[in-house]
Regions:
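Flavin (primarily FAD) binding-site architecture
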Residues: 207-222
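C-terminal catalytic lobe of FAD-dependent flavoproteins
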Residues: 155, 163, 221-244, 249-270, ...
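Helix-loop-beta segment of a Rossmann-like dinucleotide-binding subdomain
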Residues: 129-167, 188, 273-280, 352-359
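Glycine-rich FAD pyrophosphate-binding loop
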Residues: 23-44
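Beta1/beta-strand and adjacent pyrophosphate-binding region of the FAD-binding site
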Residues: 1-14
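A conserved short coil-to-beta-strand element within the FAD-binding core of flavoproteins
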Residues: 173-187
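Core beta-strand elements of the Rossmann-like FAD/NAD(P) dinucleotide-binding domain
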Residues: 2-4, 195-204
Length: 395
């Protein structure tokens, strides 16, 4: 039977990042992905590398600080994949978040970024408010501009996987884990690929299956306790409208949430929603489409991309594509808006050779991978490192 130090289940950004970090630390690594790399949420996110300005409202300062540090690192390590982008926040007379609140929030955002090169913001003069064609100017009192970053999430995931491969990690696509037998010295896995059923023994196993994390735990013997989760779907629409000159940070006209209008390969991308779902497979709903188009129409009711007033039918005709990513959040009451977004690492006393990742953010994947690798080293001991992940360029 094949023997390795570490097996990872899941080929999203978290899984490939753990593969890279662990391989750099000197461990032998096999990653099993039942489909293709970045087939799930890691290709269906909002494409942003950002601190999460809105998380300040729920007091998640540590998460914002960590995310801003991660943003700085990725701009350095992946300059061809992660690009600084201007963000714009229009403020209207009826906005829930007034100019003073936003100025305070942006000041704190800059402080938490340690005033790096993207940590500054400014209030734009009224003559600059028309830089977004068709954006509603009636009732606007301020427009703030700050900086964050954008990426192609699928390409970034594949770049991390390529780096892991160069370090010796064996990444296998089309390989579905079927059973997991936890033993005192590791885990015995059965999996299926194009050549049939196979077996693998690892000294440590990381469950990075994303939305399917508990489904994978159900295949473990002896049985292991699962953490209660909610599946929260984030949907996006790609519109056949010329890309805006930056990212617009807009208050929803329907609730307290924030929605982004973003440039994406020359077109306009709008998202995201937060819809509680009953299962791990995302599927955009008519309500989500109406929600996103309604917000766009509220702010761009006289867009220069249309003749006359913007109707719902005209906007629907502009939809080129849609996609939905699935988040895993701690189970709770009410909507998902204020729930914690930090990744959770679970390692049960009954199953010390198995670590499960719940949640995670695209921006902070490197910090997650380092934390997981530190847990691996506590069980397996340290190896002679092959590389310093803080110096490995991506892309």
């Amino acid at each position: 039977m094949e023997q390795v130090d570490l097996a990872i289940i899941g080929g999203g950004i978290s899984g490939v990042a753990v593969a890279q970090c662990a391989a750099a630390a000197g461990y032998s690594v096999v990653l099993l992905e039942k489909s293709t790399l970045a087939a799930g949420t890691s290709s269906q996110s909002s494409k942003l590398i950002h601190g999460g300005l809105r998380y300040l409202e729920s007091g998640q300062l540590d998460l914002v600080r960590e995310s801003l540090r991660a943003r700085r690192e990725l701009l350095r390590l992946a300059p061809t994949l992660v690009k600084a982008v201007p963000f714009f926040i229009p403020v209207y007379r009826d906005s829930r978040r007034g100019a003073l609140t936003l100025r305070a929030g942006l000041s704190l955002y800059g402080l938490l970024s340690e005033f790096d090169r993207l940590g500054r913001f400014r209030s734009l003069p009224a003559r600059a408010w028309g830089s977004f064609p068709g954006l509603k100017l009636a009732g606007m009192t301020h427009m703030f501009q700050y900086w964050d970053a954008q990426t192609d999430d699928a390409l970034l995931t594949k770049a991390v996987a390529d780096s892991a491969r160069l370090l010796g990690a064996d990444i296998r696509e089309g390989a579905e884990c079927l059973t997991i037998e936890h033993e005192p010295q590791g885990c015995k896995l059965s999996y299926r690929d194009a050549d049939g059923d196979k077996m693998l023994h690892c000294r440590f196993l990381v469950n990075a299956a994303g939305a399917f994390v508990n489904e994978l735990l159900a295949r473990v013997t002896p049985p292991i306790a699962q953490t209660a989760i909610d599946w929260v779907q984030g949907s996006h629409l790609l519109l056949d409208i010329p890309a805006p000159p930056g990212v617009l940070y807009l208050e929803s006209c329907f609730d307290e949430r924030v929605v982004f209008v973003m440039p994406w390969y020359g077109k306009t991308l709008i998202g995201t929603t937060e819809t509680l779902c009953q299962g791990p497979v995302p599927q955009i709903t008519r309500e989500e489409i109406a929600y996103l188009l309604g917000i766009y129409r509220h702010y761009f009711g006289g867009s220069g991309s249309f003749t006359g007033a913007v109707t719902t039918e005209a906007l629907e005709a502009k939809v080129l594509a849609h996609f939905s990513g699935m988040r895993v959040l701690p189970k709770g009451d009410g909507d998902a808006f204020g729930r914690p977004r930090e990744v959770q690492l679970y390692q049960r006393y009954s199953h010390p050779r198995l670590l499960t990742l719940y949640g995670g953010k695209l921006t902070t994947f490197r910090a997650t991978a380092k934390a997981v690798t530190a847990e691996i080293s506590k069980v397996l001991g340290k190896r002679s490192p092959k590389a310093d992940v803080d110096k490995l360029m991506l892309g």
